[in-house]
Structure formats: structure tokens, C-alpha cells
Design a protein with these regions (language model features):
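Primarily recognizes the serine-hydrolase "nucleophile elbow" in alpha/beta-hydrolase
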Residues: 217-281
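Active-site machinery of serine-nucleophile hydrolases
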Residues: 83-89, 96-110, 152-196, 318
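Secretory targeting and sorting signals
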Residues: 2-30
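The feature captures the conserved acid-bearing segment of alpha/beta-hydrolase catalytic domains
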Residues: 262-324
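Alpha/beta-hydrolase-fold serine-hydrolase catalytic core, especially in secreted/extracellular enzymes
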Residues: 32-46, 51-56, 64, 87, ...
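Short substrate-entry loop that stabilizes the transition state in hydrolases
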Residues: 122-181, 293-297
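Gly/Ser-rich "nucleophile elbow"/oxyanion-hole loop immediately N-terminal to the catalytic nucleophile
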Residues: 131-137, 182-242
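Domain-level recognition of soluble alpha/beta enzyme cores
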Residues: 34-141, 342-346
Length: 388
């Protein structure tokens, strides 16, 4: 199967294009002037809700002990966006994506004629590059994105967590997105997609490799000679991971082999790497899914739910889709491109994702009890708790 029509790509295309536009043979030129103009307007992610401003720095990490599994030559490489509590009024504005990253993403989704490159690339975020950190010791959260998509797609969640007093490391795994910029003018495309969709490589190879990537990242952030100049901000006793789609499956893979990761969140990812039969050592884990991911809707969750041997929750959002947990609904909403099959508004998608993921980490990394996680609440009627 061509990756441009893979399941994840099809879902994203449905998210960003209303059905009349997605129909074969329909021309984007049929848009009304107001709709077309909206796609050239400035797009802004929802503002973070915490008390801190957010700083941002980018790391390029090279694991010379491993050969890249997709290129099958050269060392394994990662691009990492670090976000952290920062002093107000310091730092400079950041870019959401480079023009080439945005161009490749739009082409892959069949949206290059509908959305200008500069609109997506110029999406306004709220981090500040090289901002001065607020002194302290903060829990570390690793974020891993969905298959084929850039780490920037988790920006709204990452910024909110940093504003609430976390250090956040969002990872791009080489050759696993349709386009990620690396040093030296390189833009690495999705070699992994060809191998998994056309070459017979199982998706478990992706999540297992990402688990190893995360352990290497933790080594470089918490070792004797850390790769990040602000590594002293990290409380090494409080580390967790969350991921979207294959990134969520990778949280299980990482936790299964790395005891440093104290808690995990899987946002609508099939568990290609199963939970070990012995469990996760009693560590807390949350399954957070779209409307169709309740019991009976996600077979690997049904299979592995009994193996989660610590505090656990299985939560879904009504009217949501696979990409609800990323930035895409908020961006699509502002561009006049809602998804009729996942009508949860974009701003509400971001709000709920931030609230429940943030509450999980506040409870399990900061020791702050969160009644929000005990069951349904009147102010969140979209949220379903499942106890199979």
C-alpha cells in the first residue's frame, strides 16, 4: 500500500478536507472565496494554560552504537524539541515547520493545492526560542508523534505541559515522517513507510525501535555529559512518556525495557508492541482513545488491558477521531476544514487532551490527586470511562 493512502494518511485527509472536497474529481477551485481566503489567514494554536512561559530549543542526537534500521547504513539519528518553563519576555518566536517540511506534509495528504505552504509552516505557536529557563527541577515527559507525521503535530500539548511545570522532549525518529529537517540541509523522508507498507516489515519493528530511541534520549539527557545545556532542570526521578498513534504504542515498548519511565499515556495507538505478560511493574498507564476505541473497538487494547498491573484508565472522547489528540483539529477548524466524521470542535479537542493528559502526569509525577480521573464530570460530557 502506498503510504499516501495508508490508514493514518486517509484519516488525516478526512480530518483536513470536508467530504465534498475529498471526493474524487472535485476541484479545490470550487471553494467559495471566503473558504479559500481562510486558508491563507494566520493560524494560531491555543494558548498554554499554565503559569509559565515556554522556552524551546532543538537537539540533534546521534546514536553511533546503532545502525539506522530503515536506511540500513549510518548511525541512528533523532531530532528533539525541548520545551521548558521559561522567564517571560525572553527568547524569540519559533517556527512551526520549515517550508519544506510543510510542503511535503501537504503533498502527502493531497492538500498542496488547498492550503498554502506558508499557512501551515507559519502556524503560530507560543514557545520562545532560547528563552531563559525558570530555575527549578521539573519532571520530564517524552512525546512521540504518530507514524508519518512530524513531532510538531504535538506542539499544543507539549507547550501546555511545559507551561504547567514540566520539561518536555518531543522526538522525531529518523525516516519515520514524510519530511523532517536534519542538519546539513537534509530532509529525511519516510523510508520506514515503504518497508512497513510494501516490504512486509511488521509495525512492531517501528514501536520497538522507538523504544530504543527513547532510552538513548534519556541517556543523553540525564547522563554524566548531557546533550542539553539546561539538563539540570530535569528531575531524573520523575520521567514519563506519552505518544500519539504509533508513538503511544512506543510508550509501552519503552516502558517494557526502561524502568526509568515511571508512567505512560497511549493516545489512540494500536499496541503493536504488546504489554509484557508480567505487566509494567505496577507503573500507571492511561489509554486515551477516539470515539471508536472503546472496548471491542481496539483489539490490542482489549488484549492487553488485563496485563496493565498498576493504576490504569481507559478513556475515550465522543465525536472524536484518530488525530483529535494532535494539533490538526485546531488548525483545520481555523482553516474552515472540519471533519464531519469527528465533529468534536478543534479547540475542545485540544482542551480535553491537555486536561486529561496533564491531570495524569500531575497525579503520577507530582503526587497531586486528580478527581478528574476518577470518573465522568458534568463539565466534560464527551468523556467516557471504560472498565471492561
Amino acid at each position: 500500500m502506498n503510504r499516501r493512502r495508508s490508514a493514518s494518511a486517509a484519516v488525516l485527509l478526512a480530518l483536513l478536507l470536508p467530504l465534498p472536497l475529498a471526493a474524487a474529481g472535485t476541484s479545490v477551485a470550487a471553494d467559495s472565496p471566503s473558504a479559500a481566503e481562510s486558508r491563507r489567514a494566520a493560524v494560531e494554536l491555543p494558548r498554554p494554560t499554565g503559569r509559565f512561559s515556554v522556552g524551546q530549543e532543538t537537539l540533534h542526537l546521534v546514536d553511533r552504537s546503532r545502525t539506522d534500521p530503515w536506511a540500513q547504513s549510518g548511525p541512528r539519528e533523532l531530532m528533539v524539541t525541548m520545551r521548558y518553563p521559561a522567564q517571560r519576555g525572553t527568547g524569540a518566536p519559533v517556527h512551526y515547520l520549515t517550508s519544506e517540511e510543510a510542503r511535503l506534509l501537504l503533498i502527502d495528504r493531497g492538500l498542496d493545492k488547498a492550503i498554502p505552504v506558508e499557512t501551515l509552516a507559519g502556524t503560530a505557536a507560543h514557545s520562545r526560542s532560547n528563552a531563559r529557563p525558570v530555575a527549578g527541577r521539573y519532571p520530564l515527559i517524552v512525546l512521540s508523534p504518530g507514524y508519518t507525521v512530524h513531532r510538531a503535530t504535538l506542539t499544543a500539548l507539549a507547550e501546555d505541559l511545559a507551561s504547567r511545570g514540566y520539561v518536555v522532549a518531543a522526538v522525531d525518529h529518523a525516516y519515520e515522517s514524510v519530511g523532517t529537517a536534519f542538519p546539513g540541509g537534509r530532509v529525511l523522508e519516510c523510508l520506514a513507510c515503504d518497508k512497513t507498507e510494501e516490504g512486509g516489515t511488521p509495525m512492531r519493528a517501528v514501536s520497538d525501535n522507538r523504544g530504543r530511541d527513547v532510552s538513548f534520549l534519556l541517556d543523553r539527557l540525564t547522563g554524566r555529559h548531557p546533550a542539553w545545556r539546561h539538563a539540570g532542570l530535569i528531575d531524573q526521578s520523575r520521567i514519563a512518556m506519552a505518544g500519539h498513534s504509533i508513538g503511544g504504542a512506543s510508550a509501552v515498548a519503552a516502558m517494557a525495557t526502561d524502568p526509568r519511565i515511571r508512567a505512560g499515556v497511549n493516545m489512540d495507538g494500536g499496541l503493536h508492541t504488546p504489554v509484557p505478560e508480567a505487566g509494567l511493574g505496577g507503573r500507571p498507564f492511561m489509554l486515551l482513545g477516539e470515539q471508536k476505541s472503546g472496548p471491542g473497538g481496539m483489539s490490542s487494547w482489549d488484549r492487553d488491558w488485563p496485563l496493565l498491573d498498576g493504576w490504569k484508565r481507559w478513556i475515550t472522547f465522543a465525536d472524536s477521531g484518530h488525530f483529535t489528540f494532535s494539533d490538526f483539529p485546531a488548525i483545520a477548524e481555523q482553516l474552515g476544514l472540519p471533519d464531519p466524521e469527528a465533529p468534536l470542535p478543534g479547540t475542545r479537542s485540544v482542551e480535553l487532551t491537555r486536561r486529561y493528559v496533564g491531570a495524569f502526569f500531575d497525579q503520577h509525577l507530582k503526587g497531586k490527586p486528580q478527581p478528574l480521573l476518577d470518573g465522568p464530570t458534568p463539565d466534560a460530557p464527551e468523556v467516557r470511562f471504560h472498565t471492561p
